[in-house]
């Protein structure tokens, strides 16, 4: 691989959410309708809207696949198959996947000047909560406040984490945008699909 003679800026970087990403700031009255954790058959399970959610096979992300595990697959160089097998040997989660200072140190090793950071688990939660728009908005209000605390919207001018927006409730989205702008947001993330309506359909 050729090397750049200047630091790169990565527009598609990701983190793995902390276990309390959706729970730290959610109102107590909404907890059972949003995102919770439960111990079931000795395993930590994610409950979304009171149901086991399987969007991510192991939403604790510990252990997790090695970086680039699916590179050959996404480049069309190998056929698909059993996804668990394709992930290969798993590693304990790295501090750099959840701690912004550890990530900045890693970025320096990688030659990155800065990066936009996007969710992993959170991108599947809008679909999971589409039939309960108040819970959907409460969940992402909580998530975005966790994101600001743990990663920051423009941390040290290097980490630009994107809060998640849904248009299921446009009034909520407008207020959330005002809050995000007041906290220095530079980039947001939204689902690439029609907006959900309060009945769970689309606008």
What kind of feature is each model-predicted range?
Residues 1-203:
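Helix-coil boundary/capping segments in enzymes
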């Amino acid at each position: 691989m050729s090397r750049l003679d200047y630091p790169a800026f990565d527009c598609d970087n990701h983190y793995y959410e902390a276990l309390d990403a959706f729970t730290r700031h959610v109102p107590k009255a909404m907890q059972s309708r949003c995102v919770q954790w439960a111990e079931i058959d000795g395993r930590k399970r994610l409950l979304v809207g009171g149901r086991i959610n399987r969007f991510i096979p192991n939403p604790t992300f510990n252990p997790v696949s090695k970086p680039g595990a699916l590179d050959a697959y996404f480049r069309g160089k190998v056929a698909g198959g059993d996804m668990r097998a394709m992930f290969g040997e798993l590693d304990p989660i790295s501090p750099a996947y959840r701690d912004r200072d550890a990530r900045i140190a890693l970025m320096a090793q990688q030659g990155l000047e800065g990066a936009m950071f996007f969710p992993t688990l959170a991108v599947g939660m809008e679909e999971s909560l589409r039939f309960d728009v108040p819970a959907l908005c409460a969940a992402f209000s909580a998530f975005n406040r966790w994101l600001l605390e743990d990663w920051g919207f423009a941390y040290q001018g290097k980490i630009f984490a994107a809060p998640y927006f849904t248009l299921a409730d446009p009034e909520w989205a407008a207020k959330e945008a005002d809050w995000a702008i007041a906290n220095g947001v530079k980039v947001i993330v939204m689902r690439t699909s029609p907006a959900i309506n309060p009945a769970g359909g689309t606008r």
